[in-house]
Amino acid sequence: SKHLEFPNGVVVNDKQEIFISDNRAHCVKVFNYEGTFLRQIGGEGITNYPIGVGINANGEILIADNHNNFNLTIFTQDGQLVSALESKVKHAQCFDVALMDDGSVVLASKDYRLYIYRYVQVPPIGL
């Protein structure tokens, strides 16, 4: 659906596209500045109940969700899956996410804490 159900995070790229995480639709919806729906990134079973969206230094879309544990799913801006990470730490429900300059992810949680996750992406090994 091109309509927003429960928007809760937003980021804009340098191509005048607006990326909005939609908690109830389990995805990020992309619109242009005129409000025209362009595409969807993620979906149920991939990005369950997203709490936020960001763009990292590589221009990739990071979608944070906290269905079961904290999950971070990384996509190209076209919507191709790059990688998916799952926290091994069980913590309280998170309500917001932000990216730091070094690529770390900061979560604000229901238990009045901030959680900082650092991740390293390893390039694929060529044959």
What is the role of each PLM region?
Residues 1-127:
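Eukaryotic scaffold repeat domains enriched in small/polar residues
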